[in-house]
A protein has these predicted regions:
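Alpha-helical assembly-interface signal, strongest on the long, hydrophobic N-terminal helix that forms
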Residues: 2-78
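Short, conserved structural patches
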Residues: 2-3, 51-177
């Protein structure tokens, strides 16, 4: 019995075509996931930077003549209390003008709905579950560090993807008084 010569199948190359059809949506999906992760990373970096600056300012009296507002702004932007041309921003596009410091003595730019109603002489209450119906036992001062108007710029892999402006990123901590 004689075998017929090898015949090429009609399905030859079908896997390559299927792979090509699936590859582009998979690349777009993977890049989108990476871009979303990058946005979350930048948001968390800003949150941690405001926390560091609020912690730094919490040991200073707001009435101190050496109160380091500009150093705290540099701490948010550069991760260091000194601003310099050699420093790189923690996140691209962040400037010290986007950082607002609010406390008992500095209230410019502190009138947003997300801000506390007051920064000095906040009453503290007894052990009645911190309810305002308890007896006031003292007062504290707070300091707020806020990043306002930061715009996240996506990587240029998506030409149609628009930039995102984050909401106010705020940290409030108790301050010495």
């Amino acid at each position: 019995m004689k075998r017929s010569p090898f015949r090429r199948s009609r399905t030859r190359g079908a896997a390559a075509v299927e792979f090509a059809l699936v590859l582009m949506p998979m690349i777009v999906l993977a890049t989108g996931v990476a871009e979303f992760g990058r946005a979350i990373y930048q948001y968390e970096t800003l949150t941690k930077a405001t926390r560091d600056a609020a912690r730094y300012l919490s040991i200073w009296l707001p009435t101190d003549s050496a109160y380091p507002v500009s150093a705290a702004q540099c701490l948010v932007v550069y991760g260091s209390t000194t601003c310099g041309s050699a420093g790189t921003e923690l996140v691209p596009g962040l400037t010290t003008s986007m950082v607002t410091i609010c406390d008992a003595s500095h209230t410019t730019g502190c009138g947003d709905a997300s801000d506390p109603s007051q920064f000095s002489n906040l009453p503290t209450y007894d052990a009645n579950n911190n309810a305002a119906s308890g007896t006031a036992t003292g007062a504290i001062n707070v300091v707020e560090v806020k990043v306002k108007g930061y715009t996240y710029q996506p990587i240029p892999a998506y030409p149609g993807l628009m930039s995102i402006t984050f909401g106010n990123i705020i940290t409030v901590m108790r301050q010495v008084s």
